[in-house]
Regions:
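Extracellular/surface-associated beta-sandwich interaction domains
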Residues: 1-199
Length: 199
């Protein structure tokens, strides 16, 4: 059954990304819906295979300036994250399964977080953020000799014929970085371990 069904292995449930623009930074937050995902096409003891989150950032609607990691043939394939966190479970480094000569990076046991503050932004520019949840795939087995590479959520940005953004997936945020208006009192935020409190 694995030989016929493995190709339908699916990424974790898509998280919802929330973004707030501040002066010189953008605060990104999300929930934990992805972490209880079950992949029914994997062996029963491996079905809860969520591993972590990555955030990709681009100033391009097609996310092209983030797609800089190439495959073994030199073709753009993977996006370079500006943030990554993963479960503390001993699953670290690169996946055992390669795709066109390239392995997916699974993390370094940092611990799962639900926020990120991007302080490397310029006021007056628009940024596109994609938050993806990913799993650890499946190492080669007797049933699946090639194994299953890790998978992550898609980042969907829908454009009209004039290339204006008309919609995005729940895990994508389009944010205009701007300085606060005169007299504006910014909300405060504090970080306590994995919690981000905004007031």
């Amino acid at each position: 059954i694995y030989e016929t069904d493995y190709r339908f292995a699916q990424p974790p449930r898509m998280p919802t990304l929330t973004a707030e623009s501040k002066d010189g930074s953008i605060v990104l937050t999300w929930g934990n819906v992805s972490e209880s995902s079950r992949d029914p096409f994997l062996p029963e003891d491996l079905q809860y295979d969520f591993e972590g989150y990555k955030i990709y950032r681009s100033t391009d609607k097609y996310l092209k300036d983030a797609q800089i990691i190439t495959d073994g043939y030199g073709n753009p394939m993977f996006y370079e994250p500006i943030f990554q966190c993963d479960k503390v479970d001993g699953i670290t480094g690169f996946s055992d399964v390669t795709v066109f000569g390239t392995s997916y990076y699974l993390g370094s046991d940092t611990g799962v977080k639900h926020h990120f503050i991007d302080a490397d932004v310029i006021n007056g520019k628009t940024y596109y953020y994609a938050l993806v949840a990913y799993d650890y795939g499946l190492s080669p087995t007797d049933e699946i000799a090639t194994g299953i590479p890790p998978s992550e959520n898609n980042a969907i940005i829908e454009l009209d014929e004039n290339e204006y953004v008309i919609s995005t997936g729940p895990n994508v945020a389009q944010v205009y970085a701007k300085a606060p208006s005169a007299g504006y009192v910014s909300s405060t935020f504090e970080i306590d371990d994995n919690k981000l409190n905004i007031g």
